[in-house]
Amino acid sequence: MDNNIIIGAMTALITPFKNGKLDEQTYHKLIKRQIANGIDAVVPVGTTGESATLTHEEHRICIEIALDACKGSSCKVLAGAGSNATHEAVSLAKFAQEHGADGILSVTPYYNKPTQEGLYLHYKEIAKSIDIPVLLYNVPGRTGCDLQTETIIRLFRDCENIYGVKEASGSIDKCVDLLAHEPRMMLLSGEDAINYPILSNGGKGVISVTSNLLPDMISKLTHFALEEKYIEAKKINDELYNINKILFCESNPIPIKAAMYIAGLTPTLEYRLPLCKPSDCNLAKIEAIMKNYDIKGF
């Protein structure tokens, strides 16, 4: 497992649409741009990829495109494979493995509010259905349930292919507590605002929204921190403060998709309802802040 774990700078990919349908050509180009700018892994069909409003067929196509785009490169594919129905999550995980994904990211079940025992059994079922690495994903602000430290550690110790967790609870204390109790755990930041604090407290990588727009900066920040060059890492983190903040002025991925469109990286600005375009006020703020950054094209 040690040789197969997926850490470092990762991008939670947006899913571009054109005339209401998946824009496969743009999606492929966006991934190639990530690879060219030093990203270690891409994460298709997660929260940022609007997975909740994709059909199962679109979900699978996104994974296939990511695998094709990363072929022959060192960039890995950590495929989104989450659902609030365990059997669906298992099916998505199996698809990812069968098609060559390097690992899966699986969010906690949303809406049905399982107990900690239910969460344990959910992830145990997913883990035993595949052989590739599994990264837990805790984002209670969106799912309505919090994967507690004790449950994370229990899963890590009981399931050989569960290697870590993407923590997006916003709690540095929880992250420090987790690593204090299980230092072998691979902890990844799931929130751009706290990338540096997590990396400087033992985290092993980030799954970033901002890196859709600025993959080179997120890659440098992450690798400086992993090399314990904390002064250099903090300098980049400070430079990213304003863009990180504005990219969450509305629900993710509303602002990042707007930013990608403004930067000319996507030909259209489309969402799947109930997500919609940002307010004119926020759109103007996003555009103004973007002028302070060197955003690389294709």
Curated annotation (Swiss-Prot):
Marked site (Part of a proton relay during catalysis) residue numbers:
47, 111
Predominantly, its location class is cytoplasm
Keyword Lyase listed: yes
SUPFAM superfamilies from the xrefs?
Aldolase
List, alphabetically, the SMART domains matched: DHDPS
What is a single Pfam family found in this protein's UniProt entry?
Answer: DHDPS
State the GO CC annotations.
cytosol
Associated pathway: Amino-acid biosynthesis; L-lysine biosynthesis via DAP pathway; (S)-tetrahydrodipicolinate from L-aspartate: step 3/4
Enzyme category, top tier: lyase
**Keywords assigned by UniProt, alphabetized:** Amino-acid biosynthesis, Cytoplasm, Diaminopimelate biosynthesis, Lyase, Lysine biosynthesis, Schiff base
This molecule's function is given as: Catalyzes the condensation of (S)-aspartate-beta-semialdehyde [(S)-ASA] and pyruvate to 4-hydroxy-tetrahydrodipicolinate (HTPA).
What family does this chain come from, according to its entry? Answer: Belongs to the DapA family.
This protein's name: 4-hydroxy-tetrahydrodipicolinate synthase
Which organism is the protein's source?
A: Campylobacter lari (strain RM2100 / D67 / ATCC BAA-1060)
Source lineage? Bacteria, Pseudomonadati, Campylobacterota, Epsilonproteobacteria, Campylobacterales
